[in-house]
Amino acid sequence: MAKGKENRIVITLECTEAKKEGKTVSRYTTTKNKKNTTERLLLKKYNPNLQRHTIHKEIK
């Protein structure tokens, strides 16, 4: 049995700039270690709908 697997959770990252512009949002799924990273993630990812890199924020 693997030890410590319960610390990793699957999260969804959603584009914040597309929401403001009223366009289709882009979403990414990834994992994070909730023990080491307790606050919500903010990452710069590519949004294919806007065709540029934008800030993606962790949602529930």
Curated annotation (Swiss-Prot):
One of its GO terms (cellular component) is ribosome. GO terms for biological process: translation. The keyword Acetylation does not apply. Keywords: Ribonucleoprotein, Ribosomal protein. It comes from the Bacteria. GO terms for molecular function: structural constituent of ribosome. Belongs to the bacterial ribosomal protein bL33 family. HAMAP family: Ribosomal_bL33. NCBIfam families: PRK00504.1, PRK00595.1, rpmG_bact. This is Large ribosomal subunit protein bL33. It comes from Chlorobium phaeobacteroides (strain DSM 266 / SMG 266 / 2430).
